[in-house]
Regions:
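A conserved beta-strand element that flanks and buttresses the S-adenosyl-L-methionine
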Residues: 134
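Core SAM-dependent methyltransferase catalytic element
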Residues: 225-246
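Conserved alpha-helix/loop element of class I SAM-dependent methyltransferases that forms part
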Residues: 41-59
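Class I SAM-dependent methyltransferase Rossmann-like catalytic core
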Residues: 16-21, 25-46
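Conserved beta-strand signature within the Rossmann-like core of class I S-adenosyl-L-methionine
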Residues: 161-169
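Class I SAM-dependent methyltransferase SAM/SAH-binding core
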Residues: 62-65, 70-123
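A short glycine-rich, Lys/Arg-flanked "PGG" loop and its adjoining helix->strand segment in the class I
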Residues: 148-160
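C-terminal alpha-helical "lid/dimerization" subdomain adjacent to the S-adenosyl-L-methionine
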Residues: 170-221
Length: 246
């Protein structure tokens, strides 16, 4: 499959009026470039989500990608499990994102049989008979007060032995180290071609929208919900991916 060049992310390249970050048509159009240049190790996370899904998938169960955006994790899982006739439900509340996912889906042979896309709020989406649930940089956008209820909803809809994969931007409980890691992260973004203006403006836009937590907060919530085990399997700077087993 020949890939078209990614549209370049220049959304925050010029001075803008303050406003919250939203997943609109403009963001969806450059999201693939944006996420790959903004999240260290993103391609590794996406590839390994497919590997984890293949390991924990249960025959005739359902795989959920909650907050699927353009379907990076969805298609990684599909490529691993397409020969098993898997059922993947990809959910997002951004129509602009889902339109592009559906277009991309047409390029994967057999994907229309396996992947169902839904424009829904993941906080009220029905989850049942799930062996794999993915929250790939999604939980961080859910209001803090609602996160425990969402994880509880996921847990109740999962089969025993199933896996929950959560990727998140995180913070350190140590203020000095937290500032150090943020500075290193901004240097990473500069190395990826973003200007100081772009970094500053995007940070301001995300300030009230993306609320990161510590790894200990994630661990406590997961174990309190009833998952039998939890581990961080990947971390680069202030981004981590975790697994929880029911």
């Amino acid at each position: 499959m020949t890939k078209k060049p990614q549209a370049k992310d220049h959304i925050f390249a010029k001075n803008m009026l303050p406003g919250d970050f939203i997943f609109d048509e403009k963001v969806a159009g450059v999201f693939e470039d944006m996420i790959n240049r903004s999240v260290p190790g993103y391609s590794t996370i996406i590839a390994m989500i497919g590997v984890l899904a293949e390991r924990y998938y249960q025959k005739d169960s359902i795989i959920y990608d909650l907050g699927c955006s353009l379907g990076g994790a969805t298609f990684s899982v599909f490529e691993r499990l397409k020969d098993q006739g898997c059922s993947i439900v990809a959910i997002d509340n951004s129509i602009a994102m889902l339109k592009r996912l559906v277009t991309k889906q047409q390029k994967f042979e057999g994907a229309h049989y396996c992947i169902e896309s839904r424009c829904e709020n993941i906080q009220v989406a029905q989850i049942e008979n799930a062996s794999v649930v993915i929250l790939n940089f999604t939980l961080q956008f859910v209001p803090l007060a609602d996160r425990a209820a969402l994880i509880e909803r996921v847990f109740k809809g999962m089969n025993s032995g199933g896996v929950l994969i959560i990727s998140e931007k995180i913070i350190s409980p140590d203020n000095h180290l937290n500032e150090l890691i943020i500075e290193l992260y901004h240097q990473f973004k500069e190395n990826m071609g973003y200007s100081k203006l772009e970094i500053s403006q995007k940070r301001s836009a995300l300030e009230n929208v993306l609320i990161p937590e510590t790894l200990d907060s994630h661990r406590a919530r997961i174990l309190q919900t009833g998952f039998s085990s939890f581990e961080v399997w990947f971390q680069s700077l202030n981004f981590a991916s975790m697994v929880a087993i029911k």
